[in-house]
Amino acid sequence: TNSQINSYQEILEDLTNTFPMKRLLQGDVGSGKTVVAAIAVYAVVKSGFQVAFMAPTEVLAEQHLKSISEFLKYSDIDIYFLSSSVKDRDNVMESISTGKPGLYIGTHALIQEKVLFSNLGLVIIDEQQRFGVDQRKKLITDSDIVPDQLVMTATPIPRTTALSIYGDLDISSINELPPGRKEIISYLFNGLKGDSNLVFDKCKEHLNQNSQIFVVCPYIDESENSDIQAAEI
């Protein structure tokens, strides 16, 4: 889309500057933020540097691993995955410490004390609002050089609000959906037990249309302190 093109052009221009990039990339789920990030990854790794891509959960990190691996499958870029459950963790750690150029995708495992990047050119943080300030800074401050920073969020943030909260970041927005991508419709229920049938009816309606549905609940188990419906119920 045009907004994707504008976004990656802004990022590539930042990467050529003599000072580090600090940019926020925002766009709805499905708007194509990951492919824009993949373009930045390609540019930085082909320049001989490492890229650290941190996501808040292992599930989300694995999704990025799958998506970016598909985008870059015809390139010669090495892609590594680091989490607490990775079997070849020692090999990944060695590649990190020796400065081997490549993309390193992971969770909080990327900011553990033993993880020391020696050739870090770009840090990408997805859903950055789910990380603490100290966690976000750790990747940058532990590096031998000051890397470029790209943070991504699917949370809609008005530009004036974004400037007040992230005043030190330039902002790129993807406000168009790729061709063929359906608009995502959100429904909000009070969460009381009486809403269950309404939720189930809405799920049946979309399942009959062969649609995907995400149901988000505030609790996994029932809480004694609240009458809100739990996910397991």
Where on the chain are the PLM-derived regions?
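Short, conserved phosphate/pyrophosphate- and ester-handling motifs at nucleotide-, phospho-/glycolipid
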Residues: Q4
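Inter-lobe coupling/hinge segments of SF2-like helicase ATPases
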Residues: T1, Q9, T16-I233
